[in-house]
């Protein structure tokens, strides 16, 4: 699986879902259960590193998501 860096582009806190835009332009689904710090929340604009893995309905998603911001 690819390891990528990107930015949280969309985040719906009540639903715990969003989108990561990778530095190479791909849009990956993001689920709160994939946030490595266990907080289950993030913010639009946060820089992240993740693995790309299979998601629902054949879409790719961000997995093992770690924040890059200090």
Predicted segments, located by residue:
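A short macromolecule-binding patch
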Residues: 26-34
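OB-fold/S1-family single-stranded nucleic acid-binding modules
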Residues: 53-70
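Short nucleic-acid-contacting surface segments enriched for D/E, G, S/T with interspersed K/R
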Residues: 36-49
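Structural detector for short beta-strands of small beta-barrel domains
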Residues: 1-14
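A residue-level detector for short acidic-glycine micro-motifs
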Residues: 10, 22, 34, 64-67
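Short acidic/polar mixed-charge low-complexity motifs
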Residues: 2, 24-26
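Residues located in well-ordered beta-strands
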Residues: 7, 19, 49-51, 61
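Short aromatic-glycine-enriched beta-strand elements
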Residues: 14-20
